[in-house]
């Protein structure tokens, strides 16, 4: 089944995360998509700066928490950190079956660190993906 997905490290599940996951479930149910949470095996800051931030949860605790909200897929950040936003979105669409990407209001991804939501929307239109 095609996916609706969100991406983030999600160390601990706070109110903002729960709101995002509720939207993920509503949209998945309405459009018959698999709710999917993409997260990373290690915190991106650890690989980018060499310093791991203090964690609220262990890997296993985080997995257990996130599984309450959808299928959880751990990505190797080192393997995807050089991808631009467009390359990463193409990977999600073509290799993972992601039809819709749900983003938080201040979320950024890709080695090019696009500045705003409208830039991700432009890429989504180009590759035939929905973004919200």
Regions found by a protein language model. Name each.
Residues 1-132:
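Nucleotidyltransferase catalytic core that binds NTPs
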